[in-house]
Amino acid sequence: MPNAFLMDNTLIIGKLYQQFSNDILNVDVSSDMLSVTIAHPVIHEVIRFLKENPELDFGFLTTLCGIHYPDRGLPLGVVYHLHNLRENVRVRIKTFVPLTDPSLPTITDLFSAANWMERETYDFYGIIFQGHPDLTRILNVEYLDFFPLRKEYPLEDPTREDKDDRYFGR
């Protein structure tokens, strides 16, 4: 029996533009997955909208992770993957924060699964999730004074000739 309601990327982006037109910075589709870059001040409202809008119903947080692309001129970022289980549709939401103020609101009030994901993102990238119930390091030692997945440090000893950061995505 065919589904009477088939969600597609056009519907999702249309709903987002209706609510957040001034805050959408980029839209891209890769392998049929919609990717939307949002201004960081409204990220919590966008995630809430995607979850609570009855037509969209993105009620499952698949993952949340940090990113850092300094060679592309992009500061620190967070990528959220949301899933509508009823329609089996996924959406990727990205937002970027400046290195001078790497903070975003927590979404643990929307998805309890975000708790450890936000802690891991803080632990490795230093992104502070305001309002998080326990934003402490989760994998690294507490006294570590840097964030190991930021691309601010060379991967290898610069005097070694057998290693080249270009081969490791830098």
Where are these regions (language model features)?
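Terminal low-complexity/charged segments
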Residues: 1-170
